[in-house]
Amino acid sequence: MNPVIKKFQYGNDTITLETGRIARQATGAVLASMGKTSVLCTVVGAKEASPGQDFFPLSVHYQEKAYAAGKIPGGFFKREGRPSEKETLTSRLIDRPIRPLFPDGFVNEVQVVCTVVAAEKDVDPDICAMIGTSAALAISGIPFNGPIGAARVGYTQADGYLLNPTYQALASSELDMVVAGTQDAVLMVESEANELPEDIMLGAVLYAHQEMQAVVQAVNELAKDAGKPTWDWQPEAVNQALVDALKADFEESIGVAYRITDKQKRYDRLSELRSQAVAQLAGEGSDISQDDVKKVFGKLEKNIVRSRVVAGEPRIDGRDTKTVRPLQVEVGVLPKVHGSALFTRGETQALVVATLGSARDAQIIDALEGEHRDNFMLHYNFPPYSVGECGRMGATGRREIGHGRLARRGVAAMLPKEDQFPYTMRVVSEITESNGSSSMASVCGSSLALMDAGVPLKAPVAGIAMGLVKEENGFAVLTDILGDEDHLGDMDFKVAGTANGVTALQMDIKIEGITEEIMETALEQALHARLHILSEMNAVIAQPRESLSDNAPQFHTMKVDPEKIRDIIGKGGATIRSITEETGASIDIDDDGTVKIYGDDGDSLQGAINRIEEITAEAEIGEVYKGKVVRIVDFGAFVNFLPGKDGLVHISQIAHERVQNVTDYLKEGQEVDVKCMDIDQRGRIKLSIKELLPQPEETGGSDAE
């Protein structure tokens, strides 16, 4: 073994890239370390493409091993199971910047596997995994127009931009941004922020790109020392005769089809034209395959749409570059639910529902850095009917998890603190129609549904997706892109925020040469679009509802003496269990005596409050209580008048007349009203029944005159 090791300083961290010692049968393998966090990144590429392969089969798998943090997995099987949401999101984070760097026409299968084998608790391994993947691809010899660098950026007003901040530093940061790019271009941005202005966000992107050049340089040096020979791969030659034939016979018809503004009608017409082209050019006796015809047909579609946009002609649906599609905003659309909204923008529609629960409904997340609870969940569902198709239903896909997380980032900064609003919140966005930017429709719908549920958001949030078409003779930034514009364009740029600033920014770029000017233009257009959408939303609901829905759980916090906690819980939990069973409420008790009570309705809540007040109540001199006789003795009776509290009614306090036998007046189990007369220094309570009885009328006549 002759391992090659490359070390370099990256901000406050030392990065180590090592190859040639582990996983030597992979096409490329690098053990990347950042401090005490290590990720083994491997790349395997198939030397030959599968016959008939017409797309690039790239798969990226990021996996966190429990042993990396010195843990044993939970569960019955005690081994890692299906990917967690964090693993899925990081897999997408690695995939997005590397995918556009493989050359057009390269359809050999490539698999990237990143395994976290050692982890510090205060460092997210994702940046280390991205750097390791870049290095593994660079030394593999697989055709790849890299390498890439990656950086996480934080921001505080006091310190400015922070490079690769730890979890502790991020806790006080107003920004959490991940940027990836090559030596010359930014390729991907993923971020959440606390209402930061556009210039700060753009500055963070440029700062990250500048700092990541250290990574690009180090990976290039590693590839020079340890790289394998570059594959002898050439793209298939263009069949110019086929291109010319399709242009001559179908270019005009395709152009007319792209004037049809209705998505389904447009798709039907294009499908019809595609079938005609296949029948005409790939029929019997032809050496041209159906796939070849469809591929060239698709490129012709792309060229037609792009050239029109750059030339300033109307877009597919007739809009100019800055117009947002017609909006329709509704709230309170569903009965029984806690909050709901229907947000429609053109042919994209999201039905969003907000549900409130108790603290115990929070999601428990067992991560490498330790276990924590999450009291806000946003789930995004994209059923096949939303695009008029039949399709697979079942487990949540990577795309749905990624879009849900983006929508969550947009809204999360505006949520109230847990001590102000102690509910667990779950938002579900059902995409019922889709033609572009359903994740941003989910942001708008989530904001509306949460306000409809009475959640005190700091400000309403809206989101918009921007696109880009860039040609040699100019570029056009498109506001509120359609699905076709996303597919045929060069950039997907999503911005969510309030009227005051940006809360989430996601950018995926398919080409090099995106300049600062283009990003500035996109952010400026996105701001105008966001303010327009917010004005439409505010016309329907501008403030959170003053009270929660009647269907939402009711909540009350009370403080008790910590010494009383054991009385509320009871022996083996019997008392608290009886309260929850009788009232239907759920109760959480903190060690400091804070009691949080959640009831399904007002009656449930009040019932639980009353029971706890009874249990924790202290006897007060002069107060009247309803009690039950629990024991009779010669000198009086003991009466239970509060949970766990008995007092003595002395024989002299039973009646106004002289009492010879207590049993003539009282029986065990009898309910009586008693008045608290005194509590001595030893805590013994003296009660009286006599004090509550009417005074007897005096007998005997008046004096004679």
From Swiss-Prot:
One of its GO terms (molecular function) is magnesium ion binding. Keywords: Cytoplasm, Magnesium, Metal-binding, Nucleotidyltransferase, RNA-binding, Transferase. Residues 622-690 form the S1 motif domain. InterPro entries: ExoRNase_PH_dom1 (IPR001247), ExoRNase_PH_dom2 (IPR015847), ExoRNase_PH_dom2_sf (IPR036345), KH_dom (IPR004087), KH_dom_type_1 (IPR004088), KH_dom_type_1_sf (IPR036612), NA-bd_OB-fold (IPR012340), PNPase (IPR012162). SUPFAM superfamilies: Eukaryotic type KH-domain (KH-domain type I) (SSF54791), Nucleic acid-binding proteins (SSF50249), Ribonuclease PH domain 2-like (SSF55666), Ribosomal protein S5 domain 2-like (SSF54211). One of its GO terms (biological process) is mRNA catabolic process. Its EC number is 2.7.7.8. It is found in: Cytoplasm. It catalyses: RNA(n+1) + phosphate = RNA(n) + a ribonucleoside 5'-diphosphate. GO terms for cellular component: cytosol. Residues 553-612 form the KH domain. Mg(2+) binds at D486, D492. It is an enzyme of class 2 (transferase). SMART domains: KH (SM00322), S1 (SM00316). Its cofactor is Mg(2+). Transmembrane segments: none annotated. Belongs to the polyribonucleotide nucleotidyltransferase family. Involved in mRNA degradation. Catalyzes the phosphorolysis of single-stranded polyribonucleotides processively in the 3'- to 5'-direction. Component of the RNA degradosome, which is a multiprotein complex involved in RNA processing and mRNA degradation. This is Polyribonucleotide nucleotidyltransferase. It comes from Teredinibacter turnerae (strain ATCC 39867 / T7901). The gene is pnp.
